[in-house]
């Protein structure tokens, strides 16, 4: 089943989900040959396991707060804060509060849908579904 992605010229609403966050799911927003955007929704205490992306990426905290574990260091993202991660850097995300994040990935040429390498076999490629621990 194909995912319903945004089309060129389509306006995308990225407002905070507010009270609807707890019932919302992570989902792909758009995907092109070189770019992928996903809205990642995590409830307080939920986490994405350690993994890395082959391309550069950004995480924008739309609402809530999350701890980003970069192995040697950690940082916190709060609403309206952005973090740039270079390609192939392992990271994990843990929600400190109910949180939604905009994940933007620059896909390297030739990688297509197989951009995500995950150390936890329960975690599927983000395009298909975002599984949390």
Task: Map each language-model feature to its residues.
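Conserved short histidine dyad/triad with adjacent acidic residue
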Residues: 23, 36-53
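A cytosolic small-molecule/anion-sensing beta-strand core signal
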Residues: 62-63, 78-79, 97
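Ligand-binding loop in jelly-roll beta-barrel domains
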Residues: 87-111
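Short beta-strand His + acidic residue motifs that chelate non-heme Fe in jelly-roll/DSBH
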Residues: 48-50, 68-69, 85, 90-96
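A short, N-terminal "cap"/entry segment at the start of jelly-roll beta-barrel domains
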Residues: 1-34, 117-133
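Short, conserved beta-strand element in jelly-roll/cupin
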Residues: 41-43, 52-67
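Structural motif
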Residues: 65-67, 74, 90, 100
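Short acidic-glycine-tyrosine-enriched beta hairpin
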Residues: 72-87
């Amino acid at each position: 089943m194909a995912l319903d992605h945004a089309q060129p010229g389509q306006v995308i609403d990225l407002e905070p989900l507010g009270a609807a966050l707890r019932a919302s799911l992570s989902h792909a927003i758009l995907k092109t040959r070189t770019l992928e955007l996903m809205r990642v929704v995590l409830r307080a205490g939920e986490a994405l396991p350690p993994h890395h992306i082959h391309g550069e990426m950004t995480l924008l905290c739309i609402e809530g707060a999350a701890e980003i574990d970069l192995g040697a260091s950690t940082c916190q993202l709060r609403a309206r804060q952005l973090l740039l991660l270079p390609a192939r850097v392992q990271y994990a995300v843990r929600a400190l509060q109910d949180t939604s994040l905009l994940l933007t990935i620059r896909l390297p040429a030739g990688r297509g849908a197989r951009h995500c390498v995950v150390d936890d076999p329960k975690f599927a490629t983000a395009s298909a579904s975002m599984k949390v621990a």
